[in-house]
């Protein structure tokens, strides 16, 4: 689990970023050599390799979010739940996170986010909750082409552009991500 407030997820016992990433691995009884290797792998994935010897509290908000993600993925979980994991990241950090997320294949990831454009690029399935009820579920293109006004969810930027330009996919839907945009059929008046 990656919490919306990443500082609340950290152990508070670690002297360094490396120690924080290693914390759960040590508690699981992993061999020391394997721990060091895994810490370096995860730190590289999260862009924290240069911060491994720093104190966790010296990191920026975005770096702390990446550290929280690193601690969550260190043990290779089968399922990962993340609550707004990019809320404190700068645009570059967000882009790097979603690029990393697009590479994740062996882990089922549930992510709560308002980063609609990024979500449309990486999500296989989107669920929409409204007033505590699931009101939609499906592939991003299916869900975002059938948004209800009272859900107060903005359409992805690509979809908004496509609507203004009257660009459609072969099935009549508007594109919602880069891959869809490449399949656009132009409608001429």
Model-derived features with residue positions:
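Conserved ABC ATPase "signature" region
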Residues: 22, 33-51
